[in-house]
Swiss-Prot record:
Residues 1-93, 134-164 are annotated as: Disordered. The chain crosses the membrane at residues 171-188. GO terms for biological process: dorsal/ventral axis specification; negative regulation of DNA binding; negative regulation of DNA-templated transcription; negative regulation of protein import into nucleus; negative regulation of transcription by RNA polymerase II; negative regulation of Wnt signaling pathway; positive regulation of viral transcription; regulation of JNK cascade. Required to control the activity of various transcription factors through their sequestration in the cytoplasm. Retains nuclear Zic proteins in the cytoplasm and inhibits their transcriptional activation. Required for dorsoanterior development. Necessary for siamois to activate downstream target genes, including gsc, during execution of the dorsal organizer program. Also regulates the transcriptional activity of TCF7L1/TCF3 by interacting directly with TCF7L1/TCF3 and preventing it from binding DNA. Involved in the development of lymphatic vessel valves. Keywords: Cell membrane, Cytoplasm, Developmental protein, Membrane, Secreted, Transcription, Transcription regulation, Transmembrane, Transmembrane helix. Residues 189-246 are cytoplasmic. It holds the Pfam family MDFI. The gene is mdfic. Residues 63-87 have a biased composition (Polar residues). It comes from Xenopus laevis. GO terms for molecular function: DNA-binding transcription factor binding. It is a single-pass membrane protein. Residues 1-170 are extracellular. This is MyoD family inhibitor domain-containing protein. Expressed broadly at a low level in the early embryo.
Length: 246
């Protein structure tokens, strides 16, 4: 059987053929760019996913190791400061201590320098010592004055012995010294007739003694007999001072 072949369609010649070839070349270019962009996006997403997975795995491994094994690594020392910075700070502190304080701008120009005398502390020390001594002396003087005032007030509070009190004391001492003789006189005067001329100078009888000027008076020489012995008088004065304080 004979097959009949169809003749090929004639290709366009001239400018139509050139335009068709250009269109055939330009059409597949956008499709290739899209495929490349898609490949790049897939690669970046895969890389990110892998990095995230590796980070998670590393963290889990570190946590397991920290929980299971003790820490054996020693802590590291902190970095030491520079010696130059330390020297500068020491120089600045030395200047401040010596009494030189300066202010400078950013350009390094000194606005003003304040000179403080270095011997200020040395001068203030003896002044403070003098003030301390003055305060101590004033305190001692005030304490002495307060003591003297207390003593004077105590002496002023004590009542001075009047001459009347001295007479009363003397009478009391004589009565205490001749208490027995006084008792005998009182008893003799009460029982009139028992009294003798030796014990008393007067009695209740008609016969009166030579020393008596009036009948039955108490002038029996008690004061003279008591004051004859000075020791007895001193003892009686002390006893009266104790028993009857003024």
């Amino acid at each position: 059987m004979s097959q009949e072949r169809e003749p090929f369609s004639p290709r366009p010649e001239g400018p139509e053929q050139v335009t068709s070839t250009e269109e055939s070349l330009l059409v597949p270019l956008p499709h290739g760019k899209c495929e490349k962009e898609n490949m790049d996006l897939e690669d970046t997403t895969l890389y990110r996913n892998k990095s995230i997975q590796t980070d998670i795995e590393d963290r889990s491994i570190l946590e397991d190791n920290s929980n299971s094994q003790p820490i054996k690594a020693q802590p590291q020392r902190l970095p030491q400061p520079n010696t130059s910075a330390l020297e500068q700070s020491e120089e600045e502190t030395g200047k401040i201590q010596n009494g030189h304080v300066g202010l400078s701008n950013i350009n390094g120009i000194h606005n003003g320098v304040k000179h403080v005398p270095a011997d200020h502390r040395n001068i203030s020390a003896p002044v403070s010592q003098k003030m301390h001594r003055k305060i101590q002396s004033s305190l001692s003087v005030s304490s002495d004055g307060s003591k003297k005032s207390k003593e004077s007030s105590a002496y002023s509070q004590k009542p001075s012995a009047s001459p009347e009190d001295g007479c009363v004391h003397c009478i009391l001492t004589c009565l205490f010294c001749e208490f027995l003789t006084l008792c005998n006189i009182v008893v003799g005067q009460a029982s009139c007739g028992i009294c003798t001329s030796e014990a008393c100078c007067c009695c209740c009888t008609e016969e009166m003694g030579d020393d008596c000027n009036c009948p039955c008076d108490m002038d029996c020489g008690i004061m003279d007999a008591c004051c004859e012995s000075s020791d007895c008088l001193e003892i009686c004065m002390e006893c009266c001072g104790i028993c009857f304080p003024s």
